[in-house]
UniProtKB/Swiss-Prot annotation:
Keywords: Cytoplasm, Lipid biosynthesis, Lipid metabolism, Metal-binding, NAD, NADP, Oxidoreductase, Phospholipid biosynthesis, Phospholipid metabolism, Zinc
Name this polypeptide is given: Glycerol-1-phosphate dehydrogenase [NAD(P)+]
MF term (GO), any: metal ion binding
The organism of origin for this protein: Methanothrix thermoacetophila (strain DSM 6194 / JCM 14653 / NBRC 101360 / PT)
Functional pathway: Membrane lipid metabolism; glycerophospholipid metabolism
InterPro entries in the record: G1P_dehydrogenase_arc, G1PDH, Glycerol_DH
Gene3D superfamilies xref list: 3.40.50.1970, Dehydroquinate synthase-like - alpha domain
Amino acid sequence: MLRMRTRSASWMELPRRVVAGAGALANIGDVCVDLRLSGRALVITGPQTRSVAGDNLAASLTDCGFEADVVITRDPRPAEVDRVKSFALDYKADFLIGAGGGRSIDIAKLAAYHLDIPYLSVPTAASHDGIASAMASLNMDGETKSIPTRAPLAIIADTGIISKAPPRLMSAGCGDIISNYTAILDWRLAKRLKCEDYSEYAAALSSMTAKMVVDMAPSIKPGHEPSAKVVVQALISSGVAMSIAGSSRPASGSEHMFAHALNRIAPGRGLHGELCGIGTIIMMYLHGGDWRMIREALKVLGAPASAHELNIPEDVVVEALTQAHKIRPERYTILGNGLTEAAARAAAETTKVI
């Protein structure tokens, strides 16, 4: 792994190939050959996504002269990552492929990072921007931790498959993208008040991506392959913005902290992108921005715009708002040192989240 010799230098790692479109999965072998990969590939997938993509990937790789095997994974926990690493070592894998939703791809990221071998990202749903970023989510001691790894060597997004995923997943992905609005506002605030490093280019790419999804919200439809392509491209752009910045700052701010706090207090009440979308409404209000625009876009996209839609009690929302600043205390946001209970309730009620 590369170690930078000077503190002023920065290391930017981006995917070398992105193939997105209907039938893209069939190109996996050609992409691997083009990237000069060779030897054995280990496909990491879930029990449901194995039949959707995992087995087809292994077969396509075999047809192109690669050896390939499949390992089924479940929750992204340290023990599961260790199990996959051991499997990859025993198999003598030369590269990994994460195929499925966020869990399989996160495990592939972490295992590949620790084994110092490349990995490819093959999403089967457009539910979050982790499909392209160097950040991996890991469940540790009942909490979700963001772990820096490396960006995928390539992304193969078959929008024919992705468009057939449950509509809720794509709506959640849109919520994750729209949350870039407040993530950038938080980042700019940290730059002004804390002199935090800030990348104009990464911020511009992230903001443009969020704006594109909001502007195109009326034409993004479930089960529609062109819509899936739009959302996938936006998620990839968001992931690239994080790679350019060298952190998750362009796509993760106070709204993500709220989402993680909510999931800690009441686990499993909503998908990551859904919680981030709701958080974005509140955080945009706190920033003095157009929170109504965020709320309306989420509703048009079929994503929840209130806690009631996810059966989350009002008191849980208020508690999450008062605790959110503790999720990443080193990351300065509009939440500052925390909201009082009264301020949290007022923000949630004003924005009609509760």
